[in-house]
């Protein structure tokens, strides 16, 4: 690697232009995607409680699929962004082919399981026969979206690694409009169409996913052809014996990221179960406060995605001092953005809560929860972009896996269980315990970042 002398913080205007362009578009894409899920919940909630609960149960399965898809996509970005820095698009093509084959294999396994034992899978999350029946009807169609989503997400990740992001926002908007229109028509039976209930929601989601995949395939095939992904010999390249090293290189990066994602994904239902044993007022307050928190979290995730591309490209270009300078700049910006987001959440909590009809007790608890989450937002806005964006994007994929394993299952889950069921602490402290990892993760993340041992050349 080159060791060009640079300033402590980068002064390269192109760095800031690239970072904020990537961050803004990815944030808008994620915001629209999150709104799609909210729209489904609102419409199904207006139709029937069992339909809403059935869809929520199926979404627990999709949550696992989503984490696997994101993990594979993040692994692809970590390697391909370095190749993009070297302008070696043929290697990006080979890696994308390997990642695509892995995504299809995982999706096929999940779809097969959903086909062969839907009741058993849904029974993991609920014992209600009514909810399982609704969930089975929903899953019958929705399972096919798992395959479509994993392919689309993988192609979007590949484009992000070469700094192409606008198409992902366009796709999300088209998906939102398509899903919303079909849901309105088929869930309730408007405009002469049959009233299909939860099956109508499944049709809307499936149609939107099919349209997403069609748009991204046409875009990669005919419009943005720098990677030439869909050449006729793609299948041969994926399985060619001489390209086994590509598979090994990808799996070496992808496996720790997938493990890290699963460590976190499995903990989420358990955290939900702990909070679900609180009072009805506390559950309602947590639901409201979490909604606002999730909208701001979209920005933090976008910062992580943009950081991974910028750092990976820097490493691919081979200037180690620039990698350090850009990393320092990103880490400070992450903290400052976190303070801004936390301040917004804290200051606007009154007007936001006024939109909901809550009991007096629930309103007070929601106010307290948002204050807690404002503090959490500062920690999360630093540790997530630095650990996932800078460190993982810099090629160190094992650090986050070990950190999540220790923090989630060694500290947060036991602490949350003790706070809720043994010590019987006030609900505010239980919520603080559940979210506490977002704060103390900052210490190992800072120490790892300052060591610069995360700079790994993967190409």
Ranges and model annotations:
Residues 1-26, 80-147, 194-254, 311-377, ...:
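Short alpha-helical transmembrane segments in multi-pass integral membrane proteins
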Residues 52-112, 149-168, 272, 283-349, ...:
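Small-residue-rich hydrophobic transmembrane alpha-helices
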Residues 21-40, 141, 152, 175, ...:
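Transmembrane helical elements of multi-pass membrane transporters/channels
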């Amino acid at each position: 690697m080159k060791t060009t002398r640079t300033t402590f913080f980068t002064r390269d205007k192109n760095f800031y232009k690239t970072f904020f362009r990537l961050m803004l578009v990815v944030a808008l894409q994620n915001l629209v995607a999150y709104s799609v899920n909210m729209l489904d919940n609102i419409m199904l909630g207006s139709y029937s409680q069992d339909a809403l609960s059935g869809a929520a149960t199926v979404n627990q399965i999709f949550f696992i699929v989503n984490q696997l898809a994101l993990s594979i996509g993040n692994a692809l970005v970590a390697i391909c962004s370095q190749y993009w820095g070297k302008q070696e698009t043929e290697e990006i093509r080979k890696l994308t082919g390997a990642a695509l084959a892995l995504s299809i294999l995982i999706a096929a396994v999940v779809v097969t399981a959903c086909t062969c034992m839907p009741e058993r899978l849904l029974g993991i999350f609920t014992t209600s026969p009514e909810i399982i029946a609704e969930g089975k009807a929903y899953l019958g169609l929705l399972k096919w979206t798992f395959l479509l989503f994993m392919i689309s997400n993988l192609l979007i990740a590949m484009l992000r690694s070469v700094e192409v992001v606008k198409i992902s926002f366009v796709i999300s908007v088209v998906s939102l409009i398509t899903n919303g229109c079909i849901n309105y028509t088929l869930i309730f039976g408007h405009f002469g169409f049959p009233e299909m209930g939860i099956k109508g929601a499944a049709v809307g989601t499936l149609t939107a996913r099919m349209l997403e995949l069609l748009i991204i395939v046409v875009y990669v095939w005919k419009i943005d052809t720098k990677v030439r992904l869909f050449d006729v010999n793609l299948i041969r390249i994926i399985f060619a014996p001489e390209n086994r090293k590509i598979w090994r290189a990808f799996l070496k990066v992808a496996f720790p990221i997938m493990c890290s994602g699963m460590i976190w994904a499995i903990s989420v239902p358990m955290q939900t179960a702990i909070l679900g044993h609180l009072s009805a007022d506390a559950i309602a307050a947590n639901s409201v406060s979490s909604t606002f928190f999730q909208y701001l979290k979209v920005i933090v995730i976008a910062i992580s995605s943009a950081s991974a591309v910028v750092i990976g490209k820097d490493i691919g270009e081979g200037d180690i001092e620039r990698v350090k300078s850009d990393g320092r700049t990103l880490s400070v910006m992450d903290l400052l953005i976190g303070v801004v987001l936390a301040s917004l959440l804290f200051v606007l909590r009154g007007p936001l809560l006024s939109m909901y009809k809550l009991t007096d007790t629930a309103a007070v608890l929601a106010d307290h929860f948002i204050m807690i989450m404002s503090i959490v937002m500062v920690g999360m806005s630093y540790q997530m972009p630095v650990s996932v964006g800078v460190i993982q994007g810099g090629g160190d994929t094992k650090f986050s896996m070990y950190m999540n394993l220790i923090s989630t299952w060694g500290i947060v889950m036991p602490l949350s269980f003790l706070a809720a069921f043994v010590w019987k602490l006030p609900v505010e402290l239980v919520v603080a315990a559940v979210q506490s990892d977002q704060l103390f993760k900052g210490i190992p993340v800072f120490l790892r970042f300052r060591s610069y041992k995360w700079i790994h050349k993967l190409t």
